[in-house]
Amino acid sequence: MSRRQTWSLLLIAFGLFYLVPLSNHGLWIPDETRYAQISQAMLLGGDWVSPHFLGLRYFEKPVAGYWMIALGQAVFGENLFGVRIASVVATALSVLLAYLLARRLWRDPRTSLACALLYASFGLIAGQSGYANLDPQFTFWVNLSLVALWYALDAGSRRARLLGWILLGLACGMGFLTKGFLAWLLPVLVALPYMLWQRRWRELLGYGALAVLAALLVCLPWALAVHAREADYWRFFFWHEHIRRFAGEDAQHSRPWWFYLPLLVVACLPWSGLLPSALRQAWHERRQAPVVFLALWLLLPLAFFSLSRGKLPTYIMPCLLPLALLMGHALVQRLRLGNSVALRGNGLLNLGLALLALAALAYLQLRKPVYQEEPFELFLVLLVIGAWAAAGLAQWRYPLRAWAAPLLASWVLIALLPAAMPNHVVQNKTPDLFVAEHLDELTGARHLLSNDLGAASALAWRLRRSDVTLYDTRGELKYGLSYPEHSQRSVPLADIRQWLWRARQDGSVAVLLRINSASDRYQLALLPGDGERYRNGNLVLAILPQVRP
């Protein structure tokens, strides 16, 4: 196959597996609805400086990630595709960086393509590409900063070196505007030991200052603007989002230190079987500069994230590009030597996982059916398992010819699995679809009320309104609700009947509830019995008409 045919086929695969599925399923709560609503509010209200969630101050992240999601909605519409396109573009750009860096490191087209394909099909990377959150964007900026660092260090001229360091600073600045100070820390974690090992610390001091200047030029305009607008922003963002998350006893998502070690293996599926051989080869080549650079990029951020008390699976996404390059390099070396042991092992692993998934599905369907009268969704999940099994079998039987078969497994998974979810999961986790079914009933509502932030943000995004009152919940909006002017945006349980009576005198009230517990059922029981009610799974929508004083 010619190079032109290869790239044409990959572009078709990108459209089919990454772009087409973006509009095939609703927004997942809590992340997708939150980011969709915040960015939509920026687009509609014109405030591009201070992030607001449901009209309340929301200082957990800077603004660039919201800008990109808002740009997607501005260009493609306030729809599922528009909300998610920023993540796909960021992932595609990271894949391109994997290709370019591999080409610069080893100057071999086959290795470059293999590294890019492995990275694009890593389960965690591919899965997040169609999910509207900030991690794919942040990962791209970190990747760009470290690729720029290598280009600067490997430059053959002073001009190229200057451009590399400037690009490093610009990427750090955009990463900071996306997710904060980590965008500065991670490149330093890699650059400092590598340049000390290379005995180039003078270059680090000189050109590093240029990178810092470039980063400041990107960050300072917004940093000063948000400080002028919201004097408390930097205190909250630094202490709550960085210090408390890293070292606080009450850190969110607390996990043991070893949490990321098994997760790293899972994140590499369907290529995890190549990990031992790739790490072994990296150890044998440990004195080579490219391998040292990639190893530092993989291990030092991984160690930093492992030391943090707060951990989420997506935090390690910046560690996966160097791992893909190490694995792709080892893979091509084995293909050239005709060594099929690792490839056969990887194929057997994927085949075993598919058979295990099939057995688990059969067991659940017999004991407590996951799919109830949902033949199409069941067919889709069987198709995913079948593709995974076929890819594993092909790589096991024909390892040197079908080495790329796991690509099919990964891409079929991300394309079909969201649409293959059972109805009870869809009803519980994507409330915007339920809201979309009742837009006519909701459009005339004077007041909106919800007991769940995910449902509230879905309601706000679909109706293009931020004024949803919270019913006996605060959650991550506790800080925004602490401002006196917003104290009435949350109604405690004891006051709900009085609040509803006053609100209904002003116009109709739409109440969207998620019913997951006894306390939620009690919240539902406190609502007046008149009006219209609609139910879908654990979602209840009540339209309470206006009453006379």
Swiss-Prot record:
Pathway named in the protein's UniProt entry: Lipopolysaccharide metabolism; 4-amino-4-deoxy-beta-L-arabinose-lipid A biosynthesis
Which molecular function GO terms apply here? 4-amino-4-deoxy-L-arabinose transferase activity; mannosyltransferase activity
Instruction: List the catalytic activities from the record.
Output: 4-amino-4-deoxy-alpha-L-arabinopyranosyl di-trans,octa-cis-undecaprenyl phosphate + lipid IVA = lipid IIA + di-trans,octa-cis-undecaprenyl phosphate
- Where in the cell does this protein reside? Cell inner membrane
Q: Does the keyword Cell membrane apply?
A: yes
**Which superkingdom?**
Bacteria
By its UniProt entry, which Pfam families does this protein fall under? PMT
Q: What GO biological process, any one, is recorded here?
A: response to iron(III) ion
Keywords (alphabetical) are:
Cell inner membrane, Cell membrane, Glycosyltransferase, Lipid A biosynthesis, Lipid biosynthesis, Lipid metabolism, Lipopolysaccharide biosynthesis, Membrane, Transferase, Transmembrane, Transmembrane helix
Q: What membrane topology is annotated for this entry?
A: Multi-pass membrane protein
Where does it sit, as one GO cellular component term?
Answer: plasma membrane
- Transmembrane as a keyword of this entry, yes or no, is yes
NCBIfam families from the xrefs?
PRK13279.1 (NF009784)
Function of this protein? Catalyzes the transfer of the L-Ara4N moiety of the glycolipid undecaprenyl phosphate-alpha-L-Ara4N to lipid A. The modified arabinose is attached to lipid A and is required for resistance to polymyxin and cationic antimicrobial peptides.
UniProt protein name: Undecaprenyl phosphate-alpha-4-amino-4-deoxy-L-arabinose arabinosyl transferase
Q: What is the lineage of its organism?
A: Bacteria, Pseudomonadati, Pseudomonadota, Gammaproteobacteria, Pseudomonadales
